[in-house]
Amino acid sequence: MAEGGFDPCECVCSHEHAMRRLINLLRQSQSYCTDTECLQELPGPSSDNGISITMILMAWMVIAVILFLLRPPNLRGSNLTGKPASPHNGQDPPAPPVD
């Protein structure tokens, strides 16, 4: 707790507020369900309508493939400028001198 008995966390999330949310949640669920059965669908997101997580992942994959194909030439790894890939033109480096 801070000085003077003031707790800044109490402004954001108080125990009373959490208990009110819990009680409201219980009251709402009691209007939909009894002890033995639920009379109708509970409110919430429906899996039949809207965009599913699979569609979102497929969209990201398509975007990734498009960005991969449209990347700039310097990131493609191909040697288009005619420069050698290694300082020894693909040959083994010379052996160090023996003393």
UniProtKB/Swiss-Prot annotation:
- Name the principal localization, coarsely classed: endoplasmic reticulum
Q: For the region Disordered, what residue ranges are annotated?
A: 78-99
One GO cellular component term noted in the UniProt record for this chain: endoplasmic reticulum membrane
Entry's Gene Ontology BP terms: blastocyst hatching
Membrane disposition:
Single-pass membrane protein
**Which ranges of this chain reside in the Cytoplasmic compartment per its record?**
71-99
Q: Pfam families annotated for this entry?
A: DUF2615 (PF11027)
User: Where, per UniProt, does this protein localize?
Assistant: Endoplasmic reticulum membrane
Q: InterPro entries, per this entry?
A: Uncharacterised_CD034/YQF4
State which residue ranges cross the membrane: 50-70
Q: Which UniProt keywords apply?
A: Endoplasmic reticulum, Membrane, Transmembrane, Transmembrane helix
Residues in compartment: Lumenal: 1-49
- Put simply, this protein is called Small integral membrane protein 14
Q: Which organism is it from?
A: Bos taurus (Bovine)
